[in-house]
């Protein structure tokens, strides 16, 4: 029996429908197998106010330019201090952290953070200090006994205070620490609600110039070298070497530019920080901005810091600072 015209039409329609579904399925598989050219990956960068080099790179859009050929976009996330920044890396909120003080990775490691060192800034011992009011009777480190001192927990200034107390034969039991983020520490200090404040630049220089505070001690004379480190999530560092190489190169380049062009750098940062250019230039003079590769030998002070905090029972567990991964650039 010869099929009717309507039957042929239905059969043809059914065949075309099946072929259409097949074409769509193949197209979908192709899309899944081949990344879209415009589907850029996002690198989430955390930074703080003292992250000078990253602040400049963010402002001029340099990282976006050099990472675009790798198919990477950038999102920026500001933190009040280093410890919450590294905590954000550990929980997966950001991928890369701009420079934090040497003490910060030690505390993060004690909390189980899986991080990788990416770069270091050479020592800048005068870029953090213990401040007292100009008229304060506190003249020596021994005079800190019994005093209420503002300090940011886990920051480099925390170690400076510990080291300064030890030099005077004191411990944290001999003082009343007030653990405050930088902005709150400054407010407490200028309001005379604390006897001393341990701060770092640019907060340090800004407060000295504006309130006439006096430096009781900085990191010189072996108290605290104050290196700063750039870190990334360990898994990000393991899988994104090309991106980190690009960032590393820009950090080295920008650090050299800041030291070679202090007035120009201060002018740019003054607008970003809301601080006058003269103050910024003075603060920058305290920093080395010498960015280099991290080495196991160069991390020797990290263990000293960890052991000192453990002895004071500020750090809850013993930390092996050599256990953190170290990413190595192609061209140190």
Question: What is the meaning of each model-derived region?
Answer:
Residues 20-31:
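Bacterial N-terminal signal peptides
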Residues 54, 124-130, 213-214, 226-230, ...:
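Small-molecule pocket liners
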Residues 103, 177-178, 183-271:
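Pocket-lining segment of extracytoplasmic ligand-binding domains
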Residues 238-314:
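Secondary-structure end/capping motifs
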Residues 307-332:
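Conserved C-terminal helix/tail region of periplasmic/extracytoplasmic solute-binding proteins
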